[in-house]
Swiss-Prot record:
PROSITE patterns: P_GLUCOSE_ISOMERASE_1, P_GLUCOSE_ISOMERASE_2, P_GLUCOSE_ISOMERASE_3. This is Glucose-6-phosphate isomerase 1. It catalyses: alpha-D-glucose 6-phosphate = beta-D-fructose 6-phosphate. Its EC number is 5.3.1.9. It comes from Chromohalobacter salexigens (strain ATCC BAA-138 / DSM 3043 / CIP 106854 / NCIMB 13768 / 1H11). The gene is pgi1.
Length: 548
C-alpha cells in the first residue's frame, strides 16, 4: 500500500526543510528581484501574492512534484464527473454542478443532474423576485420586510457570510436575520423585534431532522401562531430548503415552497444550492447568478491551469509545507474588510470539518498531520488583539491577508488607511525589527510567512471565486493526505450522544461515565421531569398503562 511519508518526494521535502530552515524570506527577495512577479498570479478579479512565504524555488518545485505524483488529477476528474469520492457515505460530491453554467450534462449515479438543478434555480428566481417585488404577501396582505434563516453549520455559515459580505447590494426594504444557536436567547432576541405579519422564515436543514434547527423552527412557528395567524397561515410565512419534502410539508410548509437540494451536496458546500436562497432574496437572483459565475470561473481555472500556475493548488501545497514539514498547527485568516468579518468562521468550518481526519481512505490511521486549526478575525481589530503573539510569540502561524481594492465612495481615506495597515503588517511579519541597540523585548524576529489575496472589488462574482478558491484548496490537501474531505463522522457522534442523553435524562443514565452522570444530576435540579423529552416519555408511559 502507498505510504505518503515514504515517497521519494516527501523525503526530499524533509531534507529541504533541514537545508532551508534558517533561511530568511527577505533574503529570497534580495537574491531574486523578480520573486514577486514569479510568485503572484491573477484569476479574474482575484490577485494572489504568495512571495512572502518561507518557500525557496527548490521547495516549491518539490511541492509541485508532490502534487504531480499524487492522485490529484484523477480525483479532480472524478469529483467533477460525479464519481463516488465520498466513500464512507457512498456519495458523489457535486457542489461544482450547482454552479455549472454550460450546456454539458453532469451525471450522478448515471443520471444527468442539471435539469433538476436548473429547475430549482428557476424556482429560486420566481420566489426571490416575488418577495423582493412585494408580490408575495403575508397572511395580512402586507409585503415581507424581514427574512429569518433558521439553520446551523453549512445551512447558516455560508448564506450568513455572503449576505453580510454583500450588504451593499441588499434590497433596501428587506432585513435579514440568521438564527443558528439552540440557545433560546438567540431566537428570542431576533423574534422580539419582528412583526409576524411581515416576517418570512426559511427553515434550512438537509434532512429536516437537525435537532437545533427543528427546535428553533418550532419555536418560531409557535411565536407566529401565538402572535398572529392560524395554522393555515403558516404556509405564507414558512418555506424550507431541504431534501426531505415530506417532513417539511408535515411542518406546515406548502409543497411548492420546499426548495430541493440533494444528498450529494455537503452542508459546508451548500451555499450554491437552495441553501443560498437568503442570498438571492438579499442581492437579487441576478446577483446570486453572478456569485455562481465567479465560482464557476474558479472551477475552470482549477481544472485547466497547470499546477505551477494553479491558485488553489499552490495555496494547498504551501499549506502542506507548513503543516507537515515546518510544524505549523494553525492558520490565520485575516480579512482587511469589515464586510468579510464572517469569512474566518465560514472557512473554519470548511477546512476543519473537511480535513480534520486521522484515518485515510484506505481505513488506515495516518502518521502525519492533516488539517490545521483555522481561526482569525478582521485585520484592523486583530492588530489590537492577537497580532502581538504572531509578531513575538513562540507559535509559527502562516497568515492569509484578504482585502478588496476599491473603496466605498466617501470613505476613501478609511480604505486607504485599512490597506496601508495590511501592507505594513505583511511587511513587518516578514522583515521584523532587530536593532542591535535595543533589548530583546523590543525586537520582532520577523520571518513570519503570509499570503495576500486582493479582490478588485467585493462583488458577488469575486466573492464566489474566493469561496471556490478555498474549497478547492481544501480538496487538494485532502487528496494529498489521502483522506475523505467530505464526511464528518465526528459531528455525527456528538449528535447521537446528545440524543441518548436527552432520552435518558429522566430515567437510566447508568451507561454514561461518572462525570456525565454527575453533571446530569445537576441539570435535573433545573429540569425535574419537565424537559420536552421527559414529558414525552412520561406521556408515553401513561398511554402504555391505559386500556381501551
Amino acid at each position: 500500500m502507498f505510504q505518503l511519508t515514504r515517497s521519494v518526494t516527501w523525503r526530499a521535502l524533509e531534507r529541504l526543510k533541514q537545508e532551508t530552515f534558517d533561511d530568511r524570506i527577505s533574503d529570497y527577495f534580495a537574491a531574486d528581484p523578480q520573486r514577486f512577479e514569479k510568485m503572484s498570479l491573477r484569476v479574474g478579479g482575484l490577485f494572489l501574492d504568495y512571495s512572502k512565504h518561507h518557500v525557496s524555488d527548490a521547495v516549491l518545485a518539490k511541492l509541485i512534484e508532490l502534487a504531480d505524483h499524487s492522485a490529484l488529477v484523477q480525483r479532480r476528474a472524478q469529483m467533477f464527473s460525479g464519481d463516488i469520492i465520498n466513500v464512507t457515505e457512498d456519495r458523489p460530491v457535486l457542489h461544482t454542478a450547482l454552479r455549472h453554467l454550460g450546456d454539458e450534462p453532469v451525471y450522478a449515479d448515471g443520471k444527468d443532474v442539471m435539469p433538476e438543478i436548473q429547475s430549482t434555480r428557476e424556482q429560486i428566481k420566481r420566489f426571490s423576485e416575488a418577495v423582493r417585488s412585494g408580490e408575495w404577501k403575508g397572511y395580512s396582505g402586507e409585503r415581507i420586510k424581514d427574512v429569518v434563516n433558521i439553520g446551523i453549520g453549512g445551512s447558516d455559515l455560508g448564506p450568513n457570510m455572503a449576505c453580510r459580505a454583500l450588504l451593499k447590494y441588499r434590497h433596501p426594504e428587506l432585513n435579514f436575520h440568521f438564527v443558528s444557536n439552540v440557545d433560546g436567547t438567540h431566537i428570542q432576541k431576533v423574534l422580539q423585534r419582528l412583526d409576524p405579519a411581515t416576517t418570512l422564515f426559511i427553515v434550512s436543514t438537509k434532512t429536516f431532522s437537525t435537532q437545533e434547527t427543528l427546535l428553533n423552527a418550532k419555536t418560531a412557528r409557535r411565536w407566529f401562531l401565538d402572535n398572529a395567524g392560524e395554522d393555515a397561515d403558516v404556509g405564507a410565512h414558512f418555506i424550507a430548503a431541504s431534501t426531505n419534502r415530506k417532513a417539511a410539508m408535515e411542518f406546515g410548509i406548502r409543497e411548492e415552497n420546499v426548495f430541493e437540494f440533494w444528498a450529494w451536496v455537503g452542508g459546508r458546500y451548500s451555499m450554491w444550492s437552495s441553501i443560498g436562497l437568503p442570498i438571492a432574496l438579499s442581492i437579487g437572483f441576478d446577483g446570486f447568478m453572478e456569485l455562481l459565475e465567479g465560482a464557476h470561473e474558479m472551477d475552470r481555472h482549477f481544472i485547466e491551469a497547470p499546477f505551477a500556475e494553479n491558485m488553489p493548488v499552490l495555496m494547498a501545497l504551501i499549506g502542506i509545507w507548513y503543516i507537515n514539514f515546518i510544524g505549523a498547527e494553525t492558520h490565520a485568516i485575516v480579512p482587511y474588510d469589515q464586510a468579510l468579518h464572517q469569512l474566518p468562521s465560514f472557512l473554519q468550518q470548511l477546512d476543519m470539518e473537511s480535513n480534520g481526519k486521522s484515518v485515510d481512505i484506505f481505513d488506515q490511521p495516518v502518521n502525519y498531520k492533516t488539517g490545521p486549526i483555522v481561526w482569525g478575525q478582521t485585520g484592523s481589530n486583530g492588530q489590537h488583539a492577537f497580532f502581538q503573539l504572531l509578531h513575538q510569540g513562540t507559535r509559527y502561524v502562516p497568515i492569509d491577508f484578504i482585502a478588496s481594492l476599491k473603496p466605498e465612495p466617501g470613505f476613501e481615506d478609511h480604505h486607504f488607511a485599512l490597506l496601508t495597515n495590511m501592507l505594513a503588517q505583511a511587511n513587518a511579519f516578514m522583515e521584523g525589527s532587530q536593532d542591535g541597540s535595543q533589548l530583546d523585548p523590543y525586537s520582532c524576529p520577523g520571518n513570519r510567512p503570509s499570503s495576500t489575496l486582493l479582490l478588485d472589488e467585493l462583488t458577488p462574482r469575486n466573492l464566489g471565486a474566493l469561496i471556490a478558491l478555498y474549497e478547492h484548496k481544501v480538496f487538494v490537501q485532502g487528496v494529498i493526505w489521502n483522506i475523505n474531505s467530505f464526511d464528518q463522522w465526528g459531528v455525527q457522534l456528538g449528535k447521537r450522544i446528545a440524543g441518548e442523553i436527552s432520552e435518558r435524562i429522566d430515567t437510566n443514565v447508568g451507561d454514561f461515565d461518572a462525570s456525565t452522570q454527575g453533571l446530569l444530576s445537576l441539570v435535573r435540579e433545573y429540569f425535574p421531569a419537565s424537559t420536552p423529552d421527559a414529558k414525552a416519555s412520561d406521556n408515553n408511559k401513561k398511554s402504555r398503562g391505559k386500556t381501551s
